[in-house]
């Protein structure tokens, strides 16, 4: 590495250093601070991985589930790490670190496939890993620390977007078959655990985008394309997952279902005289 190369790529180097520092900070937090910032939700997740390893089951016996089955979060990976470390906090911290790295790589790949400049890709990843908010329902605890309750849910639309971008570019499926495999797994996993939430908020909007893309192209014949076919197939798998989740008899995932209400029911009361 010579001085000329460093001079030409100084911003790229700086952004890479920033990302490494950010991942390192998240790793240190996950390995040292989880016992001190535990809350009701995260405590349930920590206890769940202990029971999953003890019972050697994904769906636990004699367990009071909350709003979801929790398997669309780092608990599956956490249970495996618990079998090695025998420490729930360390195990979940390691699972969260893996999640952070997966997000950084996946987000970078989406932007790369979309032909975004390299420096902008690195900057976007740096922003992705920035701890915008903390607290029980903050950005970081929901994705990269604590119980990571939305970590795997959000992987569903990100994986689907990565695949769709590749399809738009005309790449052969053999180059990204593994992404389709992971996307299908997380689609089914999330459906079983959390009900129709991600289907309504992530998968169906992507179908809407693809339909709009065809309409803008003014060629209705293009409506029968592999991108829409892929999304419809994933939606069907999602619906099957919902049915499977409900047939477990453990939980209805009511807390994760979308409840649509009439906004007129919440109008302000008339001012007093």
PLM features: what roles do these ranges have?
Residues 200-233:
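Perimembrane helix-loop-helix junctions
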Residues 71, 119-168:
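Membrane-interface micro-motifs in multi-pass membrane enzymes
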Residues 16, 94-119, 159-162:
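Transmembrane-helix motifs of polytopic, lipid-linked glycan transferases
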Residues 32-40, 54-76:
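Membrane-proximal lumenal/periplasmic loop motifs of glycosylation machinery
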Residues 57, 76-99, 103, 115:
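Juxtamembrane segments of multi-pass membrane glycosylation machinery
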Residues 1-26, 230:
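Start-transfer (signal-anchor) and selected internal transmembrane alpha helices
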Residues 178-196, 202-205:
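Membrane-interface alpha helices of multi-pass inner-membrane proteins
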Residues 266-273:
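Conserved small/polar residues in nucleotide/adenosyl-binding loops
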């Amino acid at each position: 590495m010579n001085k000329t190369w460093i001079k030409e790529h100084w911003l790229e180097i700086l952004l890479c250093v920033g990302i490494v520092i950010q991942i390192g900070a998240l790793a240190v937090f996950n390995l040292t601070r989880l016992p001190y910032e535990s809350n009701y939700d995260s405590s349930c997740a920590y206890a769940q991985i202990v029971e999953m390893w003890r019972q050697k089951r994904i769906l636990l016996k004699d367990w009071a589930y909350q709003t979801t089955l929790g398997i669309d979060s780092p608990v599956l990976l956490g249970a495996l790490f618990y079998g090695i470390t025998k420490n729930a906090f360390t195990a979940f911290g390691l699972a969260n670190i893996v999640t952070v790295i997966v997000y950084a790589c996946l987000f970078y790949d989406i932007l790369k496939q979309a032909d975004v400049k390299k420096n902008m890709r690195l900057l976007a990843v740096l922003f992705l890993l920035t701890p915008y908010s903390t607290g029980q329902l903050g950005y970081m605890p929901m994705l990269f620390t604590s119980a990571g309750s939305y970590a795997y849910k959000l992987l569903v639309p990100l994986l689907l977007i990565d695949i769709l971008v590749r399809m738009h570019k005309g790449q052969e499926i053999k180059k990204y078959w593994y992404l389709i495999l992971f996307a299908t797994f997380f689609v089914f996993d999330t459906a079983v655990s959390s009900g129709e939430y991600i289907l309504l908020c992530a998968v169906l909007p992507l179908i809407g985008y693809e339909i709009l893309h065809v309409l803008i192209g003014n060629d209705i014949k293009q409506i029968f394309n592999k991108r829409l076919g892929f999304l419809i197939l994933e939606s069907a798998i999602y619906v099957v997952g919902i049915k499977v989740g409900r047939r477990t008899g453990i939980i209805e995932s009511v807390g994760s279902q979308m409840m649509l209400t009439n906004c007129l029911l919440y109008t302000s009361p008339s001012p007093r005289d």
